[in-house]
Amino acid sequence: MQWNMAQSLWKVLSKQPGDPTKVHSKRNGKIIQSQVICGTGSNARHVQFKFFLNNRLTNCTDRSWEGPFEFFPWVHEYVADARPTLLLAHMGAHVHSIAAYEEAMASFMRSVALRNSSSLDRVIFRTATPGQASCDDHSRPFPRPIDFELREGGLSNISFHWDLHPLFNSIAAREIARAARGRIRDRIALLDVYQMTSMRPDGRRGGGDCLHFLLPGVPDWWTHKLLVQLRHWAARLVRRPS
């Protein structure tokens, strides 16, 4: 997932103020590890929180680069850890063709399949989000979805391949649905935040970055949607007969 969503999720889980990069127990480039406590009293559980930067979710075994993109190994650690795990993944902005995205998505799904998943494991794949040309000119959300649609063309979409993001998301939805019909079944879900994010030309970093958002802001709403999905899964586990 994007770093700003990782920050948002960490702050919701940990309930600690400040920048998570300054309080995490271990930091190695873009590998962040920390522990958060979920629940209270006798129900409290220590949960390990990890963030890996891997722009295309590759199954590399060593840290590597391709131009400006960084790839930190994550697959071995994910597969080897026997504890119940929630994997939250995202890919899109650093892939620039349909063929490359299909290949990367297929590789990611193979990596997920390597894990001997328990009934408590969960996988959530978050969709790519829309960029907004001339974001510095916006200070409030669009009032109607069509306002984004009328403005989504232009040089920024073409030069950064933002026009491919809806196609990437269709591929992701197809692969997640296929996996849900297989061995992993109902333990995988798509977190679709494209449409809701298209309403927000504002709140972005700006100054040349019209894709990423400031915090607090839009990524916090992605986190809220994630928590709704987790509550849905939790409710199903509670209702499941023993």
Feature map (PLM): residue ranges:
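Extracellular glycan-modifying ectodomains
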Residues: 1-242
